[in-house]
């Protein structure tokens, strides 16, 4: 499958804007594309999803191995002509900021994807060539295949392009100028969600028009066509009829009746890995969306709950005022309905939650803690989570890679797991786990351990059977 990866010298290079512009430009040209985000960020794929109209996915080597990433890409070969990957942070920045492991470069090598380096030439010219040459020589295998100038005027691009090509040997595929009123706003969790960006479609259209005018799309496609083929063994393992890959070994096709799972989906709860949703569907689970902010009761006939991350702290007042939903969730969890609550969902299960103005609001009360605001990220980044006891999703001693990204903390974070940073010796306890509940700040990634989805489905089936027995 043809593919291209947009990477940067650092965060703030404009990778997201360039990636979205490219995706929409491809769409305008009638070229079907799949989108992927390097690393654990679940916000950028939401932008990709809005642009493409199909789900975006993550490619993360801390969560999964190279073969799994290749399989993810292979799943889209029948439907799409090209995969567009967006990098994370600086190109070589990996674990702990001191390693290239799990970096954008690592993903590029693992997936054999050519890379276009997005460079913002602000206050520099020849120095950019020195930086790029350093990038080229830093690792023997670098995957770098081109340069795109971002936030650059046409006159500056005409000056820089020939110099950069001469000094680096890489082609400059074009430039993306500053497009007025087409920037993405900021929020404490990186970027605002796709649902909240004002006139996102119009913004991306303007970026795409600029991309088509100033970037040589044909050259980008030629570079993408140099990508090495995904191994035939990987292709054969992936079900290429659908991006859901139902026959993939990662998601064994279950022979089960469909069970309904309520999944919180609104502006307060919207952070989910598409791969997690797919894993649950592969286990015979129908994901039924509901809004903890707007709906007064849970969906009918559900056998489990999935409360994802998001911004409940920004909507604490409205969540609190919806007492019908708060009570419904309290009763469901109290009576043993299988429940997964991650980050924002974990805060919603607490007794109280502080909003950005310092006001305290009543939440569901499933747990006895209070969520409160801090002035910096808490336990940010990757960790390895090891179960201290058996529970719905885990057996004692099992470990799984996870990720945390949150400014809010909690008075009671749980003690069911031993947490450890992959770099350094920092450890702590976290998350709550029981026979029918997982709740904690860490985001789970089901590709890292497919048995999590299997066990959740098994718990949902047992719950349904129990309810049927009660009804007899």
Predicted regions and their residues:
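ATP-dependent carboxylate-amine ligase catalytic core
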Residues: 2-17, 23-111, 119-146, 151-159
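Beta-strand->loop->alpha-helix junctions that form or flank phosphate-binding loops
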Residues: 37, 172-180, 286-294
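Acyltransferase
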Residues: 195-240, 244-255, 265-269, 430, ...
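Phosphate-binding active sites in nucleotide-utilizing proteins
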Residues: 249, 259-323, 327-332
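C-terminal and late-domain segments of enzyme folds
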Residues: 108, 269-281, 286-288, 373, ...
């Amino acid at each position: 499958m043809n593919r291209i990866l947009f990477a940067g010298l650092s965060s703030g290079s404009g990778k997201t804007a360039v990636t979205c512009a490219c995706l929409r430009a491809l769409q305008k040209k009638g070229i079907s594309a799949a989108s992927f985000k390097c690393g654990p960020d679940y916000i950028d794929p939401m932008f990709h999803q809005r642009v493409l109209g199909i789900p975006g996915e993550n490619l993360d080597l801390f969560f999964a191995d190279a073969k799994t990433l290749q399989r993810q890409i292979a799943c889209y070969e029948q439907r799409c002509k090209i995969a567009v990957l967006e990098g994370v942070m600086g190109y070589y920045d990996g674990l702990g900021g001191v390693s290239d492991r799990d970096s954008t470069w690592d993903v590029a090598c693992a997936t054999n994807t050519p890379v276009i380096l997005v460079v913002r030439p602000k206050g520099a010219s020849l120095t950019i060539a020195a930086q790029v040459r350093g990038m080229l020589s830093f690792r023997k295998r670098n995957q770098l295949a081109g340069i795109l100038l971002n936030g650059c005027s046409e006159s500056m691009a005409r000056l820089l392009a020939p110099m950069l090509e001469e000094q680096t040997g890489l082609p400059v595929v074009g430039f993306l100028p500053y497009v007025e009123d087409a920037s993405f706003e900021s929020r404490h969790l990186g970027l605002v969600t796709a649902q909240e960006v004002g006139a996102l479609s119009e913004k991306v259209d303007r970026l795409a028009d600029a991309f088509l005018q100033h970037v040589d799309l044909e050259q980008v496609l030629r570079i993408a066509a140099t990508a090495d083929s995904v191994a035939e063994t990987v292709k054969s393992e992936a079900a290429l009829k659908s991006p859901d890959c139902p026959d993939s070994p990662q998601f064994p096709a279950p022979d089960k009746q469909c069970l309904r799972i309520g999944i919180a989906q609104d502006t307060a709860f919207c952070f989910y890995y598409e791969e997690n949703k797919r894993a649950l569907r592969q286990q015979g689970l129908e994901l039924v969306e509901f809004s903890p902010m707007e709906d007064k009761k849970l969906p009918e006939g559900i056998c489990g709950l999935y409360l994802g991350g998001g911004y409940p702290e920004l909507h604490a007042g409205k969540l609190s005022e919806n007492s019908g939903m708060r009570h419904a969730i309290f009763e469901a969890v109290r009576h043993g309905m299988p429940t997964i609550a991650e980050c924002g969902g974990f805060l919603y299960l607490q007794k109280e939650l502080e909003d950005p103005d310092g006001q305290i609001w009543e939440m569901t009360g499933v747990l006895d803690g209070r969520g409160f605001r801090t002035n910096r990220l808490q336990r940010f980044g990757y960790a390895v989570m090891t179960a201290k006891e058996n529970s719905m999703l885990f057996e004692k001693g099992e470990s799984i890679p996870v990720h945390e990204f949150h400014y809010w903390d909690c008075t009671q974070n749980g003690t069911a797991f031993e947490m450890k940073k992959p770099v350094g010796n920092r450890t702590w306890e976290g998350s709550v786990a029981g026979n029918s509940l997982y709740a904690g700040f860490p985001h789970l990634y089901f590709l890292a351990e497919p048995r999590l989805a299997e066990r959740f489905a098994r718990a949902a089936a047992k719950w349904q059977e129990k309810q049927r027995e009660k009804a007899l």
